[in-house]
């Protein structure tokens, strides 16, 4: 389209009426008086933009419109049937395949002369660069070829020099051999043996042999004479002191051996005759092996555990000898049994060898090396605060007020039964709280919480004072070296006495700042919120004094606070990050468990992107439920994580086998000497979290005494399964479910086998119920109770009853047909049964204190005045723990 296009011509080209085109030009801001006026290219572009805007389309450059016109997109759909094998049956599935393809029409717009010139220059530059690269490649190829030629020449020269040196060495060896032969020829020769001379008899009784005719002279006479001096020297003298023989010496040794054996009686000649195989003589060389004269002391590398067979192999002894040595030491072990390092070291030294410690921690060393790389700049981190104190003193209520939640009401029995981890964004900054149980059974939980923490807040009720778990919490804080802040709670109650609490803490060496000490004590009320701000201020001040810092970047490491088994999510571990940053997708190792982090959850159920230092989170994706208190660390890949976990599992299993395997002889004798009637109560414990499992196991095993032993045969996290029920049925155990339930298959097995299954939600009830069950196993105890004492005043004789003691009841009641004892000078001289009890010649059933009576003792007539008759009865008393 030329530059002199009129409005009329443009209307014909676009097939639009002239009046409408004039209106569109006017709308675009261009005034034209008539259809014969000329429209420029810029005005056309302006009109096109106005029309695109009016139709709701973005403005587009001509090049883009041209390119879009040359582009087409096709959507294709194709349906087909696919057969899927699922077990024994086949299923047909309809599959729809969708394809989207875009086609672009080739061809570009015509280039301007400047663009053509630039394109030609670009192609020339590319050709020049390509030629330069080819020249450089040819030059490099020539250089490599020249280097190969030079290297081949150098190797050829070196080979020639080596051959000349070997030839020269062979000539020198031949010259030395000739000189040795000449020296040997110069020695005096031994007289030749006269074959015709008669030989002396071997024994005096043997008759002299008749002279034989002279045989023909031997053909090899000169050769035998030449070899005679060589035989005098012996075949080993020439090569004495040489460890490695050259080819010439090896050939000469072979020739000399052949010459020595050729032509002799009994030797093998060239015709194939028999060779003399007798030992000794001049041909006998030194032995290849000599028996050691001193004992061989070996250094044996021993790991943490080793089997008896492996130890015997390292000691080069038979397994029976090692077992015998172990028996002498008092250790009963079989050849396939594992023993610990100390026992293996002792038996090794007993057998005369030296034991050294073997390093079998390859995976652990690699883990330490990988974690040691996480070095960065330490930044300030939030403090970790543990709330500790006696049960029902308001620890969880205090944390509830700070978090503005209601956790205490949701706890069974109103007491905390596992560690709760939270981080709270307070006006004083972020603070991470750990809420520990106060019950006596949760000692290990409180100790674990004290080790993880930076500051311990000891909650003491103002109306209750210092209690046993309060003292225990003080000891945990001291052993962990953690600063203590005392929160005196419940000051809003009428009988609150904070001064009494301070005085009682003073006896535990916890001195308040008011009394000149260094322990901050804050009076609070978790119910009304009084003093909570002062407590947060005290925590912030203490955290500033501690200058808490940690590396915020790199691989994370920390401690497992609690763990559980969720039916829908699998193993769940609550961890506290201490260093680095824990992210989704990291590979981590927790004790003997490993896995990849599939998800992170905070205490509110949200999924954070990462967790930094001092932040507790829940981790999903582990291979199993880790132990509470295990350390966790993030590693670079899954292979290292798996190796470390398997190595730890192997060590733990071997240690457990060593601990439970064959007892020592003294242990067996002690077991035989103990009461054979000791009862055993087997338990299977399943709980919701790992910390509760540990607390229950420790608390219940501690109930054992010399009469009954409580044995936890299995414990774990999660619901009661079929395997748990089978284990309990086989061992006749009681199943305890703490905040968990049995599934349908487990209930069927429990009902069919009559297994005792009990559900609990409070640890008090568990301990009380187990005490009752154990008491039922103990049975009853027969106890003797004295009910009356009578003093003999006089003795009467009766023809029917014999001796009758006229007595006075001085204490209690004497009853008929009850067992009695006769005491003389406070010493029991007879024990029997009361045969007759009379008062005024009338038989009575009992005689009370201060009343006279006549007593006849069955089968006993040696009653004297002054004796005492003790009447007692036997009662059954239930035995308790």
Swiss-Prot record:
The gene is infB. Residues 389-396 are annotated as: G1. SUPFAM superfamilies: Initiation factor IF2/eIF5b, domain 3 (SSF52156), P-loop containing nucleoside triphosphate hydrolases (SSF52540), Putative DNA-binding domain (SSF46955), Translation proteins (SSF50447). CDD domains: IF2_eIF5B, IF2_mtIF2_II, mtIF2_IVc. It comes from the Bacteria. GTP binds at residues 389-396, 435-439, 489-492. Residues 380-549 form the tr-type G domain. The lineage of its organism: Bacteria, Pseudomonadati, Pseudomonadota, Gammaproteobacteria, Lysobacterales. Residues 435-438 are annotated as: G3. This is Translation initiation factor IF-2. Residues 172-186, 254-263 have a biased composition (Low complexity). InterPro entries: DNA-bd_dom_put_sf, EF-G-like_DII, EFTu-like_2, IF2_assoc_dom_bac, IF2_II, IF2_N, P-loop_NTPase, Small_GTP-bd. Belongs to the TRAFAC class translation factor GTPase superfamily. Classic translation factor GTPase family. IF-2 subfamily. PROSITE patterns: G_TR_2, IF2. Gene3D superfamilies: P-loop containing nucleotide triphosphate hydrolases (3.40.50.300), Putative DNA-binding domain, N-terminal subdomain of bacterial translation initiation factor IF2 (3.30.56.50), Translation factors (2.40.30.10), Translation initiation factor IF- 2, domain 3 (3.40.50.10050). GO terms for cellular component: cytosol. The keyword Coiled coil does not apply. Residues 414-418 are annotated as: G2. Residues 53-92, 163-292 are annotated as: Disordered. One of the essential components for the initiation of protein synthesis. Protects formylmethionyl-tRNA from spontaneous hydrolysis and promotes its binding to the 30S ribosomal subunits. Also involved in the hydrolysis of GTP during the formation of the 70S ribosomal complex. Residues 489-492 are annotated as: G4. Pfam families: EF-G_D2, GTP_EFTU, GTP_EFTU_D2, IF-2, IF2_assoc, IF2_N.
């Amino acid at each position: 389209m030329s530059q002199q296009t009129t409005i009329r011509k443009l209307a014909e080209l676009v097939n639009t009426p002239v009046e409408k085109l004039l209106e569109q030009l006017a709308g675009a801001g261009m005034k034209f008086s008539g259809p014969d006026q000329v429209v420029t290219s810029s005005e056309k572009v302006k009109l096109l933009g106005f029309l695109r805007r009016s139709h709701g389309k973005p403005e587009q450059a001509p090049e883009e419109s041209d390119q879009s016109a040359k582009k087409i997109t096709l959507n294709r759909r194709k349906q087909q049937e696919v057969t899927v094998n699922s077990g024994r049956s086949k299923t047909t599935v309809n599959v729809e395949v969708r394809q989207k393809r875009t086609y672009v029409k080739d061809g570009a717009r015509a280039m301007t002369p400047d663009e053509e010139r630039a394109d030609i220059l670009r192609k020339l530059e590319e050709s020049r660069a390509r030629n330069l690269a080819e020249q450089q490649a040819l030059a490099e190829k020539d250089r490599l070829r020249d280097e190969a030629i030079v290297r081949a020449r150098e190797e050829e020269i070196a080979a020639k020099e080596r051959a000349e040196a070997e030839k020269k060495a062979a000539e020198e060896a031949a010259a030395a051999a000739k000189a040795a032969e000449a020296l040997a020829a110069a020695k005096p020769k031994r007289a030749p043996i006269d074959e015709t001379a008669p030989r002396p008899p071997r024994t005096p009784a043997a008759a002299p042999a008749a002279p034989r005719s002279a045989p023909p002279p031997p053909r090899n006479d000169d050769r035998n004479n030449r070899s005679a001096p060589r035989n005098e020297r012996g075949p080993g003298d020439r090569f004495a002191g040489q460890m490695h023989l050259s080819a010439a010496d090896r050939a000469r040794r072979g020739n000399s051996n052949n010459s020595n054996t050729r032509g002799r009686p009994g030797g093998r000649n060239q015709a194939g005759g028999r060779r003399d195989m007798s030992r000794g003589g001049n041909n006998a060389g030194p032995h290849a092996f000599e028996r050691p004269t001193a004992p061989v002391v070996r250094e044996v590398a021993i790991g943490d555990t080793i089997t008896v067979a492996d130890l015997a192999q390292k000691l080069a002894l038979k397994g029976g000898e090692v077992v015998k040595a172990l028996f002498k030491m008092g250790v009963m072990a079989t050849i396939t049994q594992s023993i610990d390092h100390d026992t293996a070291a002792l038996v090794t030294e007993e057998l005369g060898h030296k034991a050294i410690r073997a390093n079998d921690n390859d995976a652990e060393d690699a883990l330490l090396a990988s974690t040691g790389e996480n070095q960065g700049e330490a930044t300030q981190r939030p403090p970790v605060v543990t709330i500790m104190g006696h049960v029902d003193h308001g620890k969880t209520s205090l944390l509830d007020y700070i978090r503005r939640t209601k956790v205490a009401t949701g706890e069974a029995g109103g007491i905390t039964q596992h560690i709760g981890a939270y981080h709270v964004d307070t006006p004083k900054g972020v603070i991470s709280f750990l809420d520990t149980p106060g019950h006596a059974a949760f000692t290990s939980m409180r100790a674990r919480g004290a080790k993880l923490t930076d500051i311990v807040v000891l909650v003491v009720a103002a109306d209750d004072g210092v209690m046993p778990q309060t003292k225990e919490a003080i000891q945990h804080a001291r052993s962990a070296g953690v600063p203590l802040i005392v929160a005196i709670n419940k000051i809003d109650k009428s009988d609150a006495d904070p001064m009494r609490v301070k005085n009682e803490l003073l006896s535990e060496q916890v001195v308040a700042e008011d009394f000149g000490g260094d322990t901050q004590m804050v009076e609070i009320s978790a119910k009304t919120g009084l003093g909570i701000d002062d407590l947060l201020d005290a925590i912030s001040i203490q955290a500033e004094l501690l200058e808490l810092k940690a590396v915020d970047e790199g691989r994370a490491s920390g401690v497992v606070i609690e763990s559980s088994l969720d039916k829908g999510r699998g193993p769940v571990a609550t961890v506290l990050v201490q260093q680095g940053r824990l992210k989704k997708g990291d590979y981590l190792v927790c004790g003997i468990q490993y896995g990849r982090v599939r998800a992170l959850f905070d205490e509110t159920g949200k999924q954070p992107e990462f967790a930094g230092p001092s932040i507790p989170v829940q981790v999903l994706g582990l291979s199993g439920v880790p132990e509470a208190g295990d350390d966790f660390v993030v590693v670079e890949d899954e292979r290292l994580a798996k190796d470390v976990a398997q190595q730890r599992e192997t060590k733990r299993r071997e240690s457990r086998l060593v601990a439970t395997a064959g007892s020592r002889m003294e242990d067996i004798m002690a077991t035989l000497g103990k009461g054979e009637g000791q009862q055993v109560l087997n338990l299977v414990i399943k709980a919701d979290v790992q910390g509760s499992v540990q607390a229950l196991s420790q608390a219940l095993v501690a109930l054992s005494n010399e009469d009954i032993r409580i044995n936890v045969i299995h414990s774990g996290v999660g619901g009661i399964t079929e395997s748990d029920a089978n284990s309990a049925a086989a061992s006749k155990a009681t199943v305890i479910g703490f905040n968990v339930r049995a599934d349908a298959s487990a209930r069927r097995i429990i009902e069919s086998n009559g297994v005792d299954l009990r559900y609990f939600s409070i640890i008090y009830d568990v301990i009380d119920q187990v005490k009752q069950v154990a008491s039922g196993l103990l049975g009853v105890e027969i106890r003797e109770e004295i009910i009356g004492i009578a003093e003999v005043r006089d003795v009467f004789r009766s023809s029917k009853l014999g001796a009758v003691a006229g007595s006075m009841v001085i204490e209690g009641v004497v009853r008929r047909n009850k067992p009695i004892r006769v005491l003389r000078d406070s010493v029991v001289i007879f024990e029997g049964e009361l045969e007759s009890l009379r008062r005024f010649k009338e038989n009575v059933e009992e005689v009370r204190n201060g009343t006279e009576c006549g007593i006849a003792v069955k089968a006993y007539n040696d009653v004297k005045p002054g004796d005492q008759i003790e009447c007692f009865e036997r009662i059954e008393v239930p035995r308790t723990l």
